[in-house]
């Protein structure tokens, strides 16, 4: 799986992952502000929410 792996303020980067999912994490009240992206599907703590997907570069 190829996932985007950059933090919000950094240039776009990708990473080849062994996990079968990618994620993007954002603040629940501001879905347009994505704080980070990466491999897997971690559990988020309030006020963050994780959105996971299966597909190359699906966490845009």
UniProtKB/Swiss-Prot annotation:
Gene3D superfamilies: CD59 (2.10.60.10)
Keyword Secreted attributed: yes
Keyword Cell membrane: no
Disulfide bonds: 3-22, 17-39, 41-52, 53-58
InterPro entries: Snake_3FTx, Snake_toxin-like_sf, Snake_toxin_con_site, Toxin_cobra-type
An example Gene Ontology CC term for this record: extracellular region
Protein purpose: Specific blocker of the voltage-dependent L-type calcium channel (Cav1/CACNA1). Inhibits cardiac contractions.
Protein name: Toxin FS-2
Species whose genome carries this gene: Dendroaspis polylepis polylepis
Lineage: Eukaryota, Metazoa, Chordata, Craniata, Vertebrata
């Amino acid at each position: 799986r190829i996932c985007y792996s950059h933090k919000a303020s950094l240039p776009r980067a990708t990473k080849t992952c062994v996990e079968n999912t990618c994620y993007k994490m954002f603040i629940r009240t501001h879905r347009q502000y994505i704080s980070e992206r990466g491999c897997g599907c971690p559990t988020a703590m309030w006020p963050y929410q994780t959105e996971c997907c299966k597909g190359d570069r699906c966490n845009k």
